[in-house]
Regions:
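Generic secondary-structure boundary/loop-capping signal
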Residues: 14-16, 40-43, 49-50, 54, ...
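Alpha-helix initiation/capping motif
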Residues: 2-4, 48, 132, 136
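Conserved SAM-binding loop and adjacent beta-strand
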Residues: 23-26, 43-64
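Residues at the start of alpha-helices and the adjacent loop-to-helix junctions
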Residues: 4, 30, 52, 77-78
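Short linear sequence motifs
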Residues: 20-24, 50, 77, 103
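Conserved SAM/SAH cofactor-binding pocket of Class I
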Residues: 61-143
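N-terminal auxiliary segments of SAM/dcSAM-dependent transferases
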Residues: 1-46
Length: 143
């Protein structure tokens, strides 16, 4: 299927981001996986392509407007749900080491498939609640 990515490209330009062809492909794959998995589990109420581009992908990247992302090396997405903003940030800023934390294992199964299908590295999923993860030595003061 041929997707019009104009909304995504224009939104990224506002944040000083220029997407390459691989990143565009990854966003399309992410969208397709999101819609496919959303049929069997509630990941998002927004499934229209243009709405996902704007309300999930572009909004996830809005942090880049106020931060110099080249100076950030690690981040955690607490309560990541369907992977927003963590996955879009990883696609656009591949140098980031990202942890996706969520209390529901079924959402992490979805995210692990997204990570694999998109060929992302330097990103991990962690099952648990924020207050519990903060007490574990492997997570405390690491991000």
């Amino acid at each position: 299927m041929n997707y019009d990515l104009t909304i995504l490209e224009e939104g990224c330009k506002e944040y000083g981001i220029q997407l390459n062809e691989e990143q565009k492909k990854q966003f399309v794959q992410y969208y397709e996986l999101l819609v496919e998995w959303n049929k069997v589990m509630n990941l998002t109420g927004i499934t229209d392509f243009k709405e996902v581009l704007l309300k999930h992908f572009v909004d996830s990247l809005s942090v880049a407007k106020g931060l110099d992302m080249t100076k950030i090396s690690t981040c955690i997405d607490v309560g990541t749900g369907a992977g927003f903003p963590g996955i879009p940030l990883k696609i656009v800023f591949p140098h980031l080491q990202i942890t996706l934390l969520d209390a529901l294992n079924k959402r992490l199964n979805f995210l692990n498939e997204v990570i694999e299908k998109l060929g992302l590295s330097g990103i991990q999923t962690v099952h648990g609640r924020a207050e519990d993860a903060a007490r574990k030595a492997e997570h405390r003061e690491k991000i």
